[in-house]
């Protein structure tokens, strides 16, 4: 069995300012997305320029942070938000919802499309290959924070989280890093390397992420304040992923 390494969540301090690994992971994700987008524009000679790319990443970053935090409080911890609304601003403590962030990015993309006259699916297809890198970084942030641990297990790589209990658990953050980050990145990046019907790359991302999340969540301990939310075995993350899967299937079929 393995033991969680108990990593200090603070990467470094600048005087009174403490810089957390969790925040750095998001910064790495946004910078990585810009670099990948820049490479795709140059390599595939896409009809994008650097100003558009920078604006898209900026809009998306706001959508991810605002939507992710608000989504977490609404989907996962509504009672805490009602009684202590100021916790909404404690982003460094963790507590971000991918699905809330996705809704934030959808709104950001809509505003971006209005400004630059691009279609929503064009933007979706462009940004989809850039997202998994950020997801991978975010899951590493979860692991460093020692949050979102897995269910009790007897597999040889089970990990004991001393701050939780003395039982070995699935390192589910690392499963999600591998599925939603690495595997999804390879899938989307390779698929988007050739010209596709508009909307297809976006559809594949929606389906791919939903499937990866449905699988990974089956190893993850449900949030203590929620437990299983449907049929006695579905977590909130799985429930929120089902509409993604259905929309992805519909979009894939519509753009065949």
Swiss-Prot record:
Its EC number is 2.5.1.145. InterPro entries: Lgt. Keywords: Cell inner membrane, Cell membrane, Membrane, Transferase, Transmembrane, Transmembrane helix. Coiled coil: none annotated. One of its GO terms (biological process) is lipoprotein biosynthetic process. It is found in: Cell inner membrane. It comes from Legionella pneumophila (strain Paris). One of its GO terms (molecular function) is phosphatidylglycerol-prolipoprotein diacylglyceryl transferase activity. It holds the Pfam family LGT. The gene is lgt. Pathway: Protein modification; lipoprotein biosynthesis (diacylglyceryl transfer). This is Phosphatidylglycerol--prolipoprotein diacylglyceryl transferase. Belongs to the Lgt family. The chain crosses the membrane at residues 19-39, 56-76, 91-111, 231-251.
């Amino acid at each position: 069995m393995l033991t969680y390494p108990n990593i200090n969540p603070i990467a470094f301090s600048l005087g009174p300012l403490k810089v957390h690994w969790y925040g750095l992971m998001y910064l790495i994700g946004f910078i990585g997305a810009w670099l990948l987008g820049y490479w795709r524009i140059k390599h595939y000679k896409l009809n994008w320029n650097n100003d558009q790319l920078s604006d898209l990443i900026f809009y998306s970053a706001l959508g991810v942070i605002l939507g992710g935090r608000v989504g977490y409080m609404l989907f996962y911890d509504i009672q805490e938000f009602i009684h202590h609304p100021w916790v909404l601003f404690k982003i460094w403590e963790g507590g971000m919802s991918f699905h809330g962030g996705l809704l934030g990015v959808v709104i950001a993309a809509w505003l971006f499309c209005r400004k630059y006259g691009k279609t929503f699916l064009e933007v979706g297809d462009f940004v989809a290959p850039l997202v998994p890198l950020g997801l991978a970084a975010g899951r590493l942030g979860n692991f460093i924070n020692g949050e979102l641990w897995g269910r009790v297990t007897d597999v040889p790589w089970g990990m004991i989280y001393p701050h939780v209990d003395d039982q070995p658990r699935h390192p589910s953050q690392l499963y999600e890093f591998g599925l939603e980050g690495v595997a999804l990145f390879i899938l989307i990046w390779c698929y988007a390397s050739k010209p596709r019907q508009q909307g297809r790359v976006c559809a594949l991302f929606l389906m791919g992420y939903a499937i990866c999340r449905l699988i990974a969540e089956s190893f993850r301990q449900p949030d203590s304040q929620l437990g299983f939310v449907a049929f006695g075995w579905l977590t909130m993350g799985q429930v929120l992923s089902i509409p993604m899967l259905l929309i992805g299937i519909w979009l894939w079929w519509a753009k065949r």
